[in-house]
Amino acid sequence: MIMSSYLINSNYIEPSFPPCEEYHQNGYMPVSSDYYERPKDPGFPHHEEASYPRSNYQEQSYDYGNVSTNDLNDFSDRHHAQPQSVSQNHGPRLTTESCVGSDGNKDCSLVSDALPGSQKSKEPVVYPWMKKVHVNTVTASYSGGVPKRSRTAYTRQQALELEKEFHFNRYLTRRRRVEIAHTMCLSERQVKIWFQNRRMKWKKDHKLPNTKIRSSSSAPSNHHVKTDATQQQQTLLPTPCSSNL
């Protein structure tokens, strides 16, 4: 109905288009060889695809079988050198002008200090709680006082054998101490210290006085006894007057 109304109406004017030659002269329509139209998909008749200009670029074929080993080495060198250049860009920028002066003998110590982690190794930090640990050996930088010896942990078998020996002999000779240390895989000093501690415990259990304390305390008492005895002897000696009587 609408199309018929346009045709019936006498005022309808058909649009006029310029000839194709003017399009070629004004550059609106390029040469037909520069354009190509892709085939339309018959499944989608309502969607028209736009035309794209053809590319005049021709890809050159390359023969990979004729690649020389020098080219491969150059490529690998450039590939490995790229991460190093990236890391250098992120680091501090140091120019050679800062090291080289007018006479060429300028000191570059300041430049080396700019990289604290590269040349100087960090010293281990020793905290106070680390100094209180019982250790056998300490480093030269240790300043926590005299190092303490580690306590010997005797096994159950070693403690049992030492108890048996202490039951028969509370004091060991040098020869017997060496034999026990050799059979129990201990040092002579460890056996000696164990017997000393065991004797102290035995005296404490039997409520016996300590010989070390008794010897130190008995020394001045003996001195007083000797002085009293000399005084009594002097009083008992006969005088010349009593002998004449």
UniProtKB/Swiss-Prot annotation:
PROSITE patterns reported for this sequence: ANTENNAPEDIA, HOMEOBOX_1, HOMEOBOX_2
Gene Ontology biological-process annotations: anterior/posterior pattern specification; embryonic skeletal system morphogenesis; positive regulation of transcription by RNA polymerase II
Positions occupied by motif Antp-type hexapeptide: 126-131
Lineage: superkingdom: Eukaryota
Compositional bias per record (Polar residues), positions renumbered to this chain: 53-73, 82-99, 212-221
Annotated stretches, region: Disordered: 34-99, 205-245
Main localization category: nucleus
GO-annotated cellular components: nucleoplasm
Biased composition, class Low complexity, residue ranges: 230-245
Similarity section: Belongs to the Antp homeobox family. Deformed subfamily.
Function: Sequence-specific transcription factor which is part of a developmental regulatory system that provides cells with specific positional identities on the anterior-posterior axis.
Protein name: Homeobox protein Hox-A4a
Organism this protein belongs to: Danio rerio
